[in-house]
Amino acid sequence: MLILTRRIGESVIIGDDIKITVLGVKGNQVRLGIDAPKDISVHREEIYERIQQEKLAQSEDQGEKTDEFE
């Protein structure tokens, strides 16, 4: 894991087209601004995990439906 130190207003560039800027720090929370192309999904980790669980459940449901027709 790469660890970087940034101050408010400073940024990190990922690849050629993703920019993450530190907007603020308050207590143990950091506000980040993320500039990325529209075709790049950006989610908080807990939201991403929920999306992955929903996709897994849907694929399992599809598998059960396929089994019924065999």
From Swiss-Prot:
Stated role: A key translational regulator that binds mRNA to regulate translation initiation and/or mRNA stability. Mediates global changes in gene expression, shifting from rapid growth to stress survival by linking envelope stress, the stringent response and the catabolite repression systems. Usually binds in the 5'-UTR; binding at or near the Shine-Dalgarno sequence prevents ribosome-binding, repressing translation, binding elsewhere in the 5'-UTR can activate translation and/or stabilize the mRNA. Its function is antagonized by small RNA(s).
Similarity field: Belongs to the CsrA/RsmA family.
Xref: InterPro entries: CsrA, CsrA_sf
One Pfam assignment: CsrA
Keywords (A to Z) from UniProt: Activator, Cytoplasm, Repressor, RNA-binding, Translation regulation
NCBIfam families: csrA, PRK01712.1
Organism the protein comes from: Coxiella burnetii (strain RSA 493 / Nine Mile phase I)
GO cellular component terms listed in the entry, alphabetical order: cytosol
Binding partners and assembly: Homodimer; the beta-strands of each monomer intercalate to form a hydrophobic core, while the alpha-helices form wings that extend away from the core.
Highest taxon listed in the record's lineage: Bacteria
This protein's name: Translational regulator CsrA 2
GO terms under biological process: mRNA catabolic process; negative regulation of translational initiation; positive regulation of translational initiation; regulation of carbohydrate metabolic process
SUPFAM superfamilies per UniProt: CsrA-like (SSF117130)
